[in-house]
UniProtKB/Swiss-Prot annotation:
<protein>
    <recommendedName>
        <fullName>Small ribosomal subunit protein bS16</fullName>
    </recommendedName>
</protein>
<dbReference type="GO" id="GO:0005737">
    <property type="term" value="C:cytoplasm"/>
</dbReference>
<dbReference type="GO" id="GO:0003735">
    <property type="term" value="F:structural constituent of ribosome"/>
</dbReference>
<dbReference type="GO" id="GO:0006412">
    <property type="term" value="P:translation"/>
</dbReference>
<comment type="similarity">
    <text>Belongs to the bacterial ribosomal protein bS16 family.</text>
</comment>
<dbReference type="InterPro" id="IPR023803">
    <property type="entry name" value="Ribosomal_bS16_dom_sf"/>
</dbReference>
<dbReference type="InterPro" id="IPR020592">
    <property type="entry name" value="Ribosomal_bS16_CS"/>
</dbReference>
<keyword id="KW-0689">Ribosomal protein</keyword>
<dbReference type="Pfam" id="PF00886">
    <property type="entry name" value="Ribosomal_S16"/>
</dbReference>
<dbReference type="InterPro" id="IPR000307">
    <property type="entry name" value="Ribosomal_bS16"/>
</dbReference>
<dbReference type="GO" id="GO:0015935">
    <property type="term" value="C:small ribosomal subunit"/>
</dbReference>
<keyword id="KW-0687">Ribonucleoprotein</keyword>
């Protein structure tokens, strides 16, 4: 089973927010997911609101889950990708 870390769209019309979820790559964008690891609100003022569970994100990355491009950018800004690469190189 190929697992991806991606965004699940929630919210009202023209006022979206997203949950960062771990899901089977074959599942629909807003369909079934395995685990929720955070959320992302791009509409929040003055800047986008992001909350991520770092431990769960690192666990799923270590197990081979592939992040989408947007999630990879969110992880990079939060410093999660750097920690993952450092842990990978330390092995």
């Amino acid at each position: 089973m190929a697992v991806k870390i991606r965004l699940k769209r929630m919210g009202a019309n023209k006022s979206p927010f997203y949950r960062v979820v771990v899901a089977d790559s074959r599942a629909p964008r807003d369909g079934r997911f395995i685990e929720q690891i955070g959320y992302y609100n791009p509409v929040a003022k003055p800047e986008a609101e992001v909350k991520l569970n770092e431990e769960l994100a690192l666990k799923w990355l270590a197990e081979g889950a592939k992040p989408s491009d947007t999630v990879r950018n969110l992880f990079s800004k939060a410093g999660i990708m750097e920690k993952f690469h450092n842990a990978k190189l330390a092995k």
